Amino acid sequence: MWLKPEEVLLKNALKLWVTEKSNDYFVLQRRRGYGEDSGGLTGLLVGTLDTVLDSTAKVAPFRILHQTPDSQVYWTIACGASLEEISQHWDWLQQNIVRTLSVFDSGEDITSFVQGKIRGLIAEEGTSAGDEEDPERFREAVLRFERLFGLPQREKLVTYFSCSYWRGRVPNQGWIYLSTNFLCFYSYMLGNEVKLVYPWDEVSRLERTSSVLLAESIRVRVRGEDHFFSMLLRLQQTYLIMQQLADYAIVRFFDKETFHAEHPLANPLHITQRALEIHARNQSFRSFFRLPQEENLCEVYESFLWVPFSHVNTLGKICVSENYLCFASQDGSQCHLIIPLWEVFSVELPDRSSRALTVCLRGKRALRFSEVRDFERLAATIRRKCGTLGSPQHCITNPDEEGVMVGQSQAVSTEALMNVFHPHDAENLDPKMLKERMKEQSWQIHFAEYGRGTGMFCTKKTRDLIVRGVPETLRGELWMLFSGAVHDMISHPGYYGRLLEDCMGSSSLACDEIERDLHRSLPEHPAFQSDTGISALRRVLTAYAHRNPKIGYCQAMNILTSVLLLYAKEEEAFWLLVAVCERMLPDYFNRRIIGALVDQAVFEELIREHLTQLTEHMTDLSFFSSVSLSWFLTLFISVLPIESAVNVVDCFFYDGIKAILQLGLAVLDYNMDNLLCCNDDAEAVTVLNRFFDSVTNKDSPLPATVQQASATANDKSIQKVDISDLIKEAYEKYGDIRTEEVENMRKRNKLYVIQTLEDTTKQNVLRVVAQDVKFSASQLDELYLLFKNHDPSLPYLDQYQLDQSQFSSLFNLLQPWTTHTHSRSLARSAFHLLDENGDGLVNFKEFICGLDILYNRSFTEKLKLLFKLHLQPDSAEDGVIRKCPERGRAKVDLQEYLKQWQEDLQRREENIKDLPRINQVQFISLTKTLYSVFHGDEEEESLYRAVARVTSLLLRMEEVGRKLQDSSPQKTPQTTPTSTSQPESSPTKPTSPESETPAESRSTHDQPESPVSQHETAPSHSDITPNSTSHPSTPTSSPTETSSPVLDTPTDTPSSPCTVRDGDWSFSFEQILASLLNEPSVVRFFERVVNTDTLITRARKNQLKDAH
């Protein structure tokens, strides 16, 4: 590899390098301790020094230096891992550079020319290290990474750090390498080499820890084993990168269906340290300000913002994206605001001395920022973006335009269902209504002071108002604002209407499920007892299923959406659902509910941290995880009365999942005494259900007909709990839980949850497969990992399946015989044979059952498998393999199912007499396969002779049979000789590889189908030898002769695949088996015990090399 020229004093390197070649301008050197003297003490010391100092010489012990006769300074220009590699660079220099250097007069000119040439060569290589901070050093690290770990060429190194890896109480100083798919570590200390390579998708725990021995370290759990890395200079940065890489690996490998192709990091080759940092920053920015997924953080400025309601300047950061100007305080005031750039009217620079700028908004509002370091650049950025976003398409400011939009969607409900079924009565002087008006007045005062809409200041006072309860009339507006759904709706005008038009009249599984659950959504509420509410709910759910078919429709979405429709317009409810499913509760609403399971694990962790008394009493907290599932999926709507649940939803839209976790802790804390008295889970469930029935909302203005009456509503002995008090207590006791902390816990537990699900799936699969094979449990476990890694992109809960190319690769890695010329065709035939349902995929059970025959079964079973591999498949004249009709995926009735089940049982008890006969082309292919399998064996010569004897014997037997048949009296067509007859049914779908002898196959198939010829000649022994290129003799026939009745057999009969022409010869499996049993060498070969563990170990080593 060419290197950027760097100075080196040769006199300081004489003790570590040995000169191999030299001329007037260049020196080729070898590192001491490598090559001839690598085994001595010098090799140990130099190797240790190279590892500790991160020297390139560890993996590139050869180098080329540039020198000039009049200078003592040398320049490194190339390095190599082997003498052959460095010699190529040396030869290139000799042929292209040395002759040219003689024309220069001074040494400086020579050095300048050489350096320029080397830099040009490096630029031509175009390596991916150009984006890194130190390209040359990163190029060297990439070289070490590739040489040390032998991973696929497409594997991309992201970053690397110096650290110590702890084995027991002994630290091993080395380097950790983080690539797109692997965590690697290498250390070499005084001859003790430590090398670790772990895929990210096998990491189940990743967290920062500290102990007495280790001040601070990173703990990585892989396959149940903990690994500790410490003494990292930038531990937090390293941990965040490792966390991101593990998360992306989980998403790519186990959740590919939700990993969008347009994702910025969908291509692993685009993942760099800088890309990871940018992506993490964008995610954090969007999550904090609840902005659409299209927004990316462009610029950040520190500044002071004048806050009019408190009359102070608050310190914070200005964040600018494509369409928004955001500010978040850093002084603990919890103040933040979001300004859409299309709302900006102008930008002024009133005071350059204080580096201030004023942003004027529509509606006669202004924001004054001061002490902005680069205020002129910020002003120019805002002006430029406002110029491109000045179009009114982003918001509706014209009342006429609004009327047009409403008129275009007459079918869409433009009123919240609560306003339709329970309109606000201004003359109602009920105490609850009076309190509701007081709440409205408090919010109006807040709006007047802090602003209203997207430009509102959000502060501690805003949260206080949320905790006390949101007025019914403002609930929809505030949900849209705090969830960020308002930004999505403004950015996509008319999107919901177009979705409804696109999905109108469509039918799908999601639509069927939606129809089934429509009448189960708040059935006690009048809005969903009429067509108005049911139709609106159907439209919103159907539109979302059409927008996001990867999620489609999941249970609990109907309950949540019905509550949204009560307080928001139909289009607003749609965008609220989008915000919940895609941003606020990611991975919740799919068939695996991974997001809910992750939050269950987070909840369990918080219980251990905050409710220690409960954890001491109940060591197994899985009960609370299972009970809380409905809490998270429905935001407590399914367990609380609707009038109380909406207060919880208020807090959720403001604080996210943090509010739900806090409330869950408060519920358990409130019932602590009763839970400690429970003896089993059933009692605990009863305690919690009774508590939820006692929760009320004394301030709710909803009429009694709407409120859900609990079973204990009239029970005076049960103490009532007001939802506002419960929420207030949750914020007071557990409000210190930060959103950032919850997100980190989510990431940490996501690895554990997915690996737990994967392990459960694996155990279930292995339990089923183990009943039919003779592999040990550990061997099955290793084979499962090999099988899984050949298709890591499938969702983890799906049964792993391989297509033909993947199967062939894995089959060739695991077959017990040495690689031979027929490996590819044999693997192809095995794939079609094992694909019992004809779907073009082989699952783990099918694969293991086939492998079990090759590894653990008797000589007869192995030979039978080889025999079946060489039978012709069910194929049409075009050569396309087609599935048998009975193996289709169509629905069948009970009788048909029982018939198929009986046939499967019969297939398991398959008798060798039921196997079809093998014709001449297939037999020749089988013989050649045997020759290839025997190649390289210690008894190769005797095995070859045995096959030749068996072939000759079978041919003589067939010839004698033909002669006896010819000399017998003429028979009717119904008594055609048995050589062309087939059994009535074939229990196994026969398959065959492509012919390895195209000339033979072509000449055979080109013949016209003919009856038995009286002049047929049997092939000679030379026709079947492994080196033979000729094909067996075939009969000649007259076109006027009539065909045999065998050829008139319908093509859909089971015997048709192996029907042969009457002029060809064929053998039964019994004949071949009987002949080979007389050859001890062949029997010994197939009865030889297979070292399964060795083959699996070899396959694991070679799998990565063949992965790409």
UniProtKB/Swiss-Prot annotation:
Cell compartments where the protein resides: Cytoplasm, Cytosol
Name of the protein described by the UniProt record: TBC1 domain family member 8B
Bias-annotated ranges (Polar residues): 1010-1024
Predominant location: cytoplasm
GO cellular component, one term: cytosol
Residues bound to Ca(2+): 835, 837, 839, 846
Domain EF-hand: 822-857
Site note Arginine finger, residues: 516
